[in-house]
UniProtKB/Swiss-Prot annotation:
It comes from Enterococcus faecalis (strain ATCC 700802 / V583). Catalyzes the conversion of uracil and 5-phospho-alpha-D-ribose 1-diphosphate (PRPP) to UMP and diphosphate. This is Uracil phosphoribosyltransferase. Allosterically activated by GTP. The keyword GTP-binding applies. One of its GO terms (molecular function) is GTP binding. The gene is upp.
Length: 209
């Protein structure tokens, strides 16, 4: 079973409270989502492998550490996942970015794929799949299904808020995928929204209704 981790760093929790507030405007919401994503990426990337290299410092040769192994690709689930990309790129600027477009049927709550655009070397990269919310788990499962069909195998899922039923569904569908969240909330309401949650993260990021 993949790892499940709530990243409860004080700065992340403080910033998450800011964007939970219903009167948080679009500008602040967007900025703080990016900040949380950057802070989370520090923990998500903690197990990236290192190797020794010999470099020349001003004082002579020295053996130091550098990243090795698979390079990173960030895969936002459209559209809300886009809001987390720039924050991670601040920390890992060389990462490539792909996109998986899904929409949720408001009646059945089932996801439907409408767009996929990925780096050509997706199979050789460590993927960070990002979406602010892990609710029913349907969108995350479908996105990861799509990535695996295209050769991806090293996948981490990163969200801001999750609920137990979404975590359980994703773990059952993809037990090899590590899940990282800033908060594990109480439940889903009858409309499939997380409570207390953030509301509709996409609408709040882009100022739409």
């Amino acid at each position: 079973m993949g790892k499940f981790q709530v990243i409860d760093h004080p700065l992340i929790q403080h910033k998450l409270t800011m964007i939970r507030e219903k009167n948080c405007g679009t500008k602040v919401f967007r900025e703080v989502v990016n900040e949380i994503a950057m802070l989370m990426a520090y923990e998500v990337s903690r197990d990236m492998p290192l190797e020794d290299v010999v470099i020349e410092t001003p004082m002579g040769k020295s053996t130091q550490k550098t990243l090795s192994g698979k390079k990173v690709a960030i895969i936002p689930i459209l559209r809300a996942g886009i809001g987390m990309v720039d924050g991670i790129l601040e920390l890992i600027p060389a990462a490539k970015v792909g996109h998986v477009g899904l929409y949720r049927d408001e009646e059945t709550l089932q996801p439907h794929e409408y767009f996929v655009k990925l780096p050509e070397d997706i199979a050789s990269r460590q993927l960070f799949v990002v979406d602010p919310m892990l609710a029913t788990g349907g969108s995350a499962i479908m996105a990861i299904d799509s990535l695996k069909e295209r050769g991806a195998s090293n996948i981490k899922f990163v969200c801001l808020v999750a609920v137990p039923e979404g975590v359980k569904a994703l773990q059952e569908a993809h037990p090899d995928v590590d899940i990282y969240t800033a908060a594990l909330d109480e439940r889903l309401n009858e409309d499939g929204y997380i409570v207390p949650g953030l509301g509709d993260a996409g609408d709040r990021l882009f100022g739409t209704k």
